[in-house]
A protein has these predicted regions:
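Active-site mouth of glycoside hydrolases
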Residues: 28-192
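Extracellular glycoside hydrolase catalytic/binding regions
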Residues: 149, 154-253, 280
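A conserved acidic beta->alpha catalytic loop
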Residues: 325, 340-348, 390
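Short, flexible, basic/aromatic active-site loop/helix in glycosyltransferases
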Residues: 414-415, 429-447, 462
C-alpha cells in the first residue's frame, strides 16, 4: 500500500529529525497523521541580545511549561534565536516561523524594494532550512485590507506567490503558507502548502459554520486555524476557558491543526508594549489562567454499523491497494463488500488476500446493478460506496458517521483528491477538467456528491428503488443525488471524509472516461430534462467545486470589499453563469469550422478555430492550481486537453441525445446566459498624491472633507469596485477616488489618493473620431482636458488635506 495512506494513531509530536509534510487535507509525520496543537509566542520586548524573545532562563521555562500544557507546536512572529531552536529541539516542539517584512506600506511600486523583500525572505529561510524543528514558514500575516485593495488583490497575490517560490527554493523540504484573515478572505496564494487563517469568532455556531466555508477555500489542502483567542479584559477568564474548550473540540473534528493566541499577555509591536488586550493563557507575571488547563469538550459521535461497498470490473491494477486502505480504517464497526461485476480478470485472488472482505460476484450488468447488489447484501444501516481506484483515509468512516447525526441528512460525502501520480500523464490528467466534483448549495449542503465517496442511508436508498440499471458506467451518482433531493432528503459535504482517487494514467483512458460521462449526461437528460440547458449542459443550483477553483479569480467585480473597503468578511462572489468565452468551445464550434472549410471560407474557419483555442486558454487559466508541478511542455498538453475534452464529452452527449430522443427542459432567461458583473468601466489614471501626518489624520477624514467641499454631486462607491468616491459628470467624464492610509511606527501615517477617470463608450468613440479627423488637434484637446482634470483634482485634494494641522504633502 502507498505510504501516503499508511496511517495510524495521530502522533502527539513528530520524532526528532522527522519532517512534517502534507497529504490531502491533513499533515503527516512520516506515515502518521500529525495534528499541530499550537500556541503563539511573542513578539516580546527585545532581550539583552536585541532578539524579540525573553531572556534565556525565562524562555526555557516558558517552552517547558507550554509543552507540559500539551502543545506540540509554537507559532513565532519572528525567526527563532539559536537558544529557542535548542529548546525546541530538546522539547520536540514544532515551529511555525513568521517572516516579517515591511508590509505596512506600498511594497509593490518600487522594484528595488520588492527584490529586497524577496532577498530578506531567502536569507532567513536559508538559515533555518535544515533545522528539524522548523515545520513551516509564513511569508506574511494579515496584510491590511485597504492596502491590499489599493495595491490590487491579483498583484498582491502574485507577490506572495513570489515570496513562497523564493522561500521554497531556499528550503525545498519545508512547508510554506500565508496567514490570512477574514477581511481579505480572497487573498490566498495558489502555491501555499496549506491554508492558514486567523479567525476570531466568539460564538461557537458562527465558528463552526465558518470552518465549513474555509474548507472550500482550502480546496484539497489542509486547513490550519493559525490564530484564535479571546480577550479576558473584555470577556473574563471563565468565558476564555469555555471558549478554548469548544474551540479545541471543533478543530479536532474539522481542521488539520490549530494555534491558540496566545501563551502570555506580553505583546510588543511596532516598538510599543501593548497593554490594553489580554489574550494570554498566562498573564504578564506568568500566572496561569483557567483556559490554560481547559480540555476539549467530549463530543458524543454516532457510531452506526457501516457497510463499505467496492464495485469493480477488471480493476486488478488498483483493487489491492484499495482494500489495504479499507482494512486499516480507524472505525470500530464496519464490513467490506467487493462486488465483482463479471470481471474477466482474476478479482478473486486479490480478495482472497483479505479474509475480512466478502466477495460477491454477478454477471456483467453494469455499475448500478453492482451497487444495488451491494446494498441488498449489506448488513449496515449506512452504505459507504467507493471505487476500486480509491484509497480511503484512515478516518474516512469516522467523519462519514458523524455526518449522519441528524435524520435530515440522507447522504454524506467528502473530497476525492488525486494522490501522487504514477506517471507523467497522470500528473497532467490530475490537473485536467472533468474530474468528479461535488456541487455545493451552500458551505454544508450539497446538490451532488461523487459516487467514489458517497455514503447513503440504506433506508433512503431503498425508498427510492435503488440505483437505476441503465446507468452502467457513469451518471448513477448524479441520478441518485437528484432523486434523493426530490424526496426531500439533504446531502451533506464533510471535508474530513477524504479518499485518494487515482486519475486516469493514460490520455486514452482519460478521453474514454470523458466520453462515458457525456453518454451518461444524455441518460440523465432523458430522466431529468429540467436539469439541462438548451445546449445540453447540466444546470446546477449550486456551485461546482473542481474545474474552477472558487478563490482563484480575483477579477475586479467579483470581490465585495464593502463601502470604503471596510467589509469584515470580504469574499469572492461568483454567479455560476457562463462568460462569453465559454460559448466558444465544444462540438458546435468544430461543426462551424468544418462548414466554413467546406464552403471555402478559410479566413472565417481560421478565426473560429482561433477563438476556440482562446476559449481553451481561458479554461486553462481558470483551472485550479495543478496538484503536482507541471513543466511548460506538460502545460501545453493540459491546454490541448482543455480544448479537446469539451468536444469529446459534448459529442458523446449529443450522440446519446439523438439515440435516446432526450431533450433539455430548462428554459433560461436571456440574462442567465451571461454572468452578471460589477466590473468597472474603462479607467484612466489621472494621478496619485500622498500626504504625511500624525495620528490625527487619515483617509476617512480626507474623504469626508472632500465630500463636503466638492461643488457637485458625490456618490459613494457600492463596495464592488476598488473605489471610495465617484464624481459623476454630465459629459461622460466621471472622476473617481481611491484612498489608503498606511500606518507606520511612532504614530506616523501616510494617506495616499489615486484619481481615476472613468470613460463611457461615447467618450471613447468621440475621442477616436477627433484623433481620426485631426491627429494633432485631437491629441492636444484630449491632453489638455486630462491635464485640467488632474490639476483640478489635485488642488481640491491638497486643499482638503493641508487644512489639517501637521499634514504635509509628499513629493513622489
Amino acid at each position: 500500500m502507498p505510504d501516503y495512506v499508511k496511517t495510524s494513531q495521530a502522533s502527539a509530536a513528530p520524532a526528532v529529525g522527522q519532517r512534517v509534510t502534507v497529504g490531502g487535507k491533513f499533515f503527516y509525520c512520516g506515515t502518521e497523521k500529525f495534528m499541530p496543537r499550537g500556541v503563539s509566542y511573542g513578539p516580546f520586548c527585545p532581550n539583552a541580545h536585541g532578539e524579540p524573545f525573553p531572556e534565556t532562563s525565562r524562555l526555557s521555562q516558558d517552552l517547558t511549561h507550554l509543552r507540559e500544557l500539551g502543545f506540540n507546536t509554537v507559532r513565532l512572529y519572528h525567526p527563532p534565536s539559536d537558544q529557542l531552536l535548542s529548546e525546541a529541539l530538546r522539547l520536540e516542539l514544532q515551529l511555525i516561523v513568521g517572516l516579517p517584512w515591511s508590509d505596512h506600506g506600498d511594497f509593490l511600486s518600487l522594484s528595488l524594494q520588492r527584490q529586497s523583500i524577496i532577498a530578506q525572505i531567502q536569507t532567513e529561510v536559508a538559515r533555518l532550512k535544515d533545522h528539524p524543528c522548523v515545520m513551516a514558514f509564513f511569508v506574511g500575516n494579515e496584510l491590511e485590507k485597504t492596502l491590499v485593495r489599493w495595491l490590487g488583490p491579483s498583484q498582491v497575490q502574485h507577490f506572495l506567490e513570489q515570496l513562497i517560490t523564493a522561500g521554497r527554493r531556499a528550503a525545498p523540504n519545508k512547508l510554506f503558507s500565508y496567514a490570512n484573515y477574514p477581511s481579505t478572505e480572497y487573498l490566498i496564494p495558489r502555491n501555499v502548502d496549506f491554508l492558514a487563517l486567523n479567525v476570531y469568532l466568539e460564538q461557537r455556531a458562527d465558528f463552526s459554520t465558518y470552518l465549513q466555508r474555509l474548507h472550500h477555500l482550502a480546496g484539497n489542502k489542509p486547513l490550519l486555524i493559525s490564530e484564535f483567542g479571546l480577550d479576558t479584559a473584555t470577556h473574563g477568564e471563565g468565558k476564555q476557558a469555555l471558549t478554548r474548550s469548544w474551540f479545541e473540540a471543533e478543530c479536532a473534528q474539522a481542521a488539520a491543526g490549530q494555534v491558540w493566541f496566545s501563551y502570555t499577555d506580553e505583546w510588543f509591536r511596532d516598538g510599543v508594549e501593548v497593554t490594553d488586550w489580554q489574550f494570554g493563557l498566562l498573564d504578564r507575571e506568568r500566572r496561569v489562567r483557567p483556559a490554560a488547563l481547559a480540555t476539549a469538550e467530549t463530543m458524543e459521535l454516532p457510531c452506526p454499523f457501516i457497510s463499505v461497498i467496492v464495485c469493480t470490473y477488471n480493476g486488478t491494477g488498483t483493487l489491492r491497494d484499495c482494500l489495504s486502505s479499507l482494512q486499516n480504517l480507524r472505525y470500530p464497526s464496519y464490513e467490506i463488500l467487493v462486488i465483482d461485476d463479471g470481471s474477466t480478470l482474476d478479482i478473486a485472488s486479490i480478495a482472497a488476500g483479505f479474509p475480512e472482505v466478502r466477495l460477491i460476484r454477478q454477471e456483467h450488468a453494469g455499475l448500478s446493478m453492482a451497487r444495488n447488489l451491494g446494498a441488498l447484501e449489506a448488513r449496515g444501516e449506512i452504505l459507504a460506496y467507493t471505487d476500486d481506484d480509491c484509497l480511503a483515509d484512515v478516518d474516512w468512516l469516522t467523519h462519514l458517521a458523524a455526518g449522519f447525526d441528524q435524520a435530515e441528512w440522507v447522504a454524506c460525502g467528502g473530497p476525492n483528491i488525486p494522490p501522487p501520480p504514477r506517471n507523467a500523464t497522470e500528473r497532467i490528467v490530475a490537473a485536467a477538467p472533468g474530474a468528479p466534483a461535488h456541487v455545493m448549495i451552500n458551505d454544508a449542503e450539497a446538490e451532488h456528491l461523487p459516487g467514489c465517496n458517497l455514503a447513503i442511508r440504506k433506508s433512503a436508498l431503498m425508498a427510492i428503488g435503488g440505483f437505476r440499471a441503465h446507468y452502467q458506467v457513469a451518471g448513477d451518482d448524479v441520478d441518485i443525488c437528484w432523486r434523493l433531493r426530490e424526496r426531500g432528503g439533504r446531502l451533506r459535504f464533510l471535508p474530513g471524509a477524504m479518499v485518494w482517487h487515482h486519475r486516469r494514467r493514460t490520455l486514452g483512458a482519460y478521453l474514454r472516461q470523458q466520453r462515458g460521462y457525456g453518454a451518461a449526461e444524455a441518460l440523465l437528460m432523458k430522466d431529468h430534462p429540467q436539469h439541462f440547458g438548451p445546449l445540453g449542459g447540466a444546470r446546477w443550483s449550486g456551485a461546482i467545486y473542481g474545474d474552477v477553483y472558487p478563490v482563484q479569480d480575483l477579477t475586479e467585480g467579483r470581490i465585495f470589499y464593502g463601502p470604503h473597503g471596510h467589509g469584515l468578511f470580504q469574499g469572492i462572489y461568483q454567479s455560476g453563469t457562463r462568460g462569453w468565452l465559454d460559448w466558444l468551445n465544444g462540438t458546435l464550434w468544430v461543426a462551424m469550422v468544418a462548414v466554413a472549410v467546406l464552403l471555402g471560407w478559410h479566413t472565417l474557419a481560421f478565426a473560429l478555430f482561433s477563438l476556440s483555442l482562446l476559449a481553451a486558454l481561458d479554461h486553462h487559466r481558470r483551472l485550479p492550481y495543478a496538484p503536482h508541478p507541471l513543466s511548460w511542455n506538460e502545460h501545453l498538453k493540459l491546454i490541448a486537453l482543455c480544448w479537446v475534452q469539451p468536444i469529446i464529452r459534448e459529442g458523446a452527449r449529443l450522440k446519446g441525445m439523438i439515440s435516446l430522443g432526450a431533450r433539455p427542459g430548462w428554459q433560461p432567461k436571456m440574462r442567465q446566459f451571461f454572468a452578471t458583473s460589477h466590473r468597472r468601466p474603462w479607467q484612466l489614471d489621472l494621478g496619485e498624491w500622498a500626504f504625511e501626518s500624525s495620528a490625527s489624520f487619515d483617509r476617512e477624514i480626507l474623504l469626508n472633507d472632500f465630500r463636503e467641499q466638492y461643488p457637485g454631486p458625490v456618490q459613494e462607491a457600492d463596495g464592488w469596485q476598488r473605489l471610495d468616491l465617484i464624481l459623476p459628470s454630465r459629459i461622460g467624464l466621471t472622476t473617481a477616488l481611491l484612498t489608503v492610509t498606511e500606518y507606520h511606527s511612532q504614530g506616523r501615517r501616510v494617506t495616499r489618493v489615486r484619481a481615476l477617470l472613468q470613460l463611457r463608450l461615447f467618450m471613447l468613440l468621440l475621442g477616436a473620431v477627433m484623433l481620426w479627423l485631426h491627429l494633432l488637434a485631437g491629441s492636444l484637446v484630449i491632453l489638455s482636458l486630462l491635464l485640467y482634470l488632474r490639476t483640478l483634482t489635485q488642488l481640491r485634494l491638497t486643499r482638503c488635506a493641508l487644512g489639517h494641522e501637521g499634514v504635509t504633502k509628499l513629493q513622489r
